[in-house]
């Protein structure tokens, strides 16, 4: 077994101060995601880990791309027959993590996932490249397959089927909006004295009210 205990580095890019924080965490999130995108350090700056829990209480994570965010929450799209969708149907409490370590930052979100309307899903689906639209029809996400060749054969079949005209939206393809109940911003600090600030909803409905802001020990 490898010993990784000697792998470490100092965090030197700067701190996060209470007086700099906006009242609305989405304002800070927008600033941070623009900075990581503009830095061009990460090839997928919108990549986030989505954690869900199954009926037995077993958590599971996967990387998903954030497609939209606003004061109502964070939006992503997926196959509605996938493991994540099945787990959300059982328990819609989820967490998101944006690991922007290149800027010595991370953002952790907790909240509830709400399924998007067909209108919202279609509005995004039509913007996808045609090959990606076809791929949505091909993959029964999270199911077992015999070999990659089976997937490629199905893709070729569906590509021929949809060679003319628009690709329709599959009924089993959709999206979710995660309405946040808390958002934590983490900025690396020297000597492991990191800065952590937690925004928590004042209103239990998750849809109204302001935010409490607390500094957390690193």
UniProtKB/Swiss-Prot annotation:
Gene3D superfamilies: Electron Transport, Fmn-binding Protein, Chain A. Its cofactor is FMN. The keyword Protein transport does not apply. FMN binds at residues 62-67, 77-78, 83-84, 106, 141-142, 186, 196. Keywords: Flavoprotein, FMN, Oxidoreductase, Pyridoxine biosynthesis. It catalyses: pyridoxamine 5'-phosphate + O2 + H2O = pyridoxal 5'-phosphate + H2O2 + NH4(+); pyridoxine 5'-phosphate + O2 = pyridoxal 5'-phosphate + H2O2. InterPro entries: Pyridox_Oxase, Pyridox_Oxase_CS, Pyridox_Oxase_N, Pyridoxamine_oxidase_dimer_C, Split_barrel_FMN-bd. GO terms for biological process: pyridoxine biosynthetic process. Pathway: Cofactor metabolism; pyridoxal 5'-phosphate salvage; pyridoxal 5'-phosphate from pyridoxamine 5'-phosphate: step 1/1; Cofactor metabolism; pyridoxal 5'-phosphate salvage; pyridoxal 5'-phosphate from pyridoxine 5'-phosphate: step 1/1. Binds 1 FMN per subunit. Belongs to the pyridoxamine 5'-phosphate oxidase family. Catalyzes the oxidation of either pyridoxine 5'-phosphate (PNP) or pyridoxamine 5'-phosphate (PMP) into pyridoxal 5'-phosphate (PLP). Homodimer. This is Pyridoxine/pyridoxamine 5'-phosphate oxidase. The gene is pdxH.
């Amino acid at each position: 077994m490898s010993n990784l205990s000697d792998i470490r580095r100092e965090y030197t890019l700067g701190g996060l101060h209470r007086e700099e924080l906006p009242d609305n965490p989405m304002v800070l999130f927008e600033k941070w995601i623009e900075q990581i995108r503009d830095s061009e350090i990460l090839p997928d700056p919108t990549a986030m880990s989505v954690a869900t829990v199954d009926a037995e209480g077993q958590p599971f994570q996967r990387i998903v791309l954030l497609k939209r965010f606003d004061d109502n929450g964070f939006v992503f799209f997926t196959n509605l027959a996938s493991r994540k969708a099945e787990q959300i149907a059982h328990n819609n409490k989820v967490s998101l993590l944006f690991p922007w370590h290149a800027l010595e930052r991370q953002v952790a979100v907790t909240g509830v996932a709400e399924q998007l309307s067909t209108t919202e899903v279609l509005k995004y689906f039509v913007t996808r490249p045609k090959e990606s639209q076809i791929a949505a029809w091909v993959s029964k996400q999270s199911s077992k397959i015999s070999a990659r060749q089976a997937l490629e054969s199905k893709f070729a079949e569906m590509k021929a089927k949809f060679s003319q005209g628009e690709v329709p939206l599959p009924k089993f393809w959709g999206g979710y909006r995660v309405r946040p109940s808390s958002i934590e911003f983490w900025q690396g600090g020297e000597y492991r004295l990191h800065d952590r600030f937690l925004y928590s909803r004042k209103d239990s409905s998750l849809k109204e009210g302001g935010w409490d802001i607390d500094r957390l020990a690193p």
